[in-house]
């Protein structure tokens, strides 16, 4: 049973789901905003906030965990340099999900995820 599981399955096998979320997290940290489906946006929010929390901690162990998750090593170093000054006074809620118009092909709910 899947009681109290944090990440939705997104109709993908575990390895594909993890790769998708890693890619979306990397893209969100790099660009600052990503357009995706609403279900993926909600799953992405958890992973991105976890990476920013690691960056706020700033320890070597946190840096290594973030490097193991995010695809771009230089992006992790830049995140760790800027996270404390950008999110130092904020206790979570680093991302914002804004719903947009449904996708034209299959009418699925779309959303924009952006860093606050």
From Swiss-Prot:
GO CC field: cytosolic large ribosomal subunit
Lineage: Bacteria, Bacillati, Cyanobacteriota, Cyanophyceae, Synechococcales
The keyword Ribosomal protein is annotated on this UniProt entry: yes
Underlying gene: rplQ
Keywords: Ribonucleoprotein, Ribosomal protein
Protein name (database record): Large ribosomal subunit protein bL17
Subunit note: Part of the 50S ribosomal subunit. Contacts protein L32.
Any coiled-coil regions, as ranges: none
GO biological process annotation, one example: translation
GO molecular function, one term: structural constituent of ribosome
Similarity-based family: Belongs to the bacterial ribosomal protein bL17 family.
HAMAP family: Ribosomal_bL17
Keyword S-adenosyl-L-methionine in record: no
Stored InterPro entries: Ribosomal_bL17, Ribosomal_bL17_sf
